[in-house]
């Protein structure tokens, strides 16, 4: 990848949930120590908000806690605003019936967070990284169609990678058995995105596989 620093950016929750449900979050630590692993604040909140309810949320909460030195959380004003909205809505949804009734009567029901909320947040994150580290390559690790679509997301110095393509790359290096790991994932998450997308940046040559530590 010709001396450029690689920033692995998670703009949507899909890859994290897939790897967590399959029991393979540790594969993210295959990136070399100099690689920045960046998770949007909204994405982290979404995948860790119900640790007492979902196994994958508990696994991700533990993973973030145990690897805090490795995982960089990108905070944005918009992300923090939407997180506050989500917390308010969750509090309402989990409130006792009498509390809900009062909130509904007084018009104090929190609004539902906007759909497609992650797109604006990741654009903010991507542009912030581009401003602070203009020579870095961003590896957008995603399952959302917005990011995997060739015509939708095309920031400079940006390489797009789907979960399946990531696993295929590790298999080419004989780090994993693709069939075994993918079977673990789809057994717990049948709707995991099966699309293999490994799209290089349009403006420079990029190669994420050279940032994988094969010696662990």
PLM regions with names:
Residues 141-145:
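Short, well-ordered beta-to-alpha junction loops that form the rim of enzyme active sites
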Residues 2-138, 148-216:
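Active-site-proximal, substrate-binding regions of enzyme catalytic domains
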């Amino acid at each position: 990848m010709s001396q450029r620093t690689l920033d692995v950016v998670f703009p949507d929750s899909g890859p994290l949930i897939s790897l967590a449900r399959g029991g393979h979050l540790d594969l993210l630590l295959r990136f070399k120590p100099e690689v920045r692993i960046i998770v949007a604040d909204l994405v982290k909140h979404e995948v860790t908000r119900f640790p007492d309810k979902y196994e994958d949320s508990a696994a991700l909460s533990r993973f973030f806690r145990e690897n805090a030195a490795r995982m960089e959380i990108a905070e944005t004003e918009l992300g923090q605003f939407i997180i506050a909205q989500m917390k308010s809505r969750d509090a309402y949804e989990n409130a006792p019936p009498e509390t809900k009734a009062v909130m509904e009567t007084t018009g104090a029901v929190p609004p539902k967070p906007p759909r497609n909320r992650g797109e604006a947040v990741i654009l903010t994150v991507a542009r912030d990284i581009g401003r602070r580290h203009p020579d870095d390559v961003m590896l957008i690790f995603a399952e959302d169609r917005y990011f995997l679509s060739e015509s939708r997301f095309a920031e400079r110095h940006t390489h797009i990678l789907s979960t399946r393509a990531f696993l295929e790359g590790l298999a080419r290096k004989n780090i994993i058995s693709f069939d075994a790991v993918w079977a673990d994932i789809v057994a717990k998450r049948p709707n995991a995105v099966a699309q293999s997308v490994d799209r290089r940046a349009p403006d420079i040559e990029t190669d994420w596989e050279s940032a994988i530590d094969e010696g662990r």
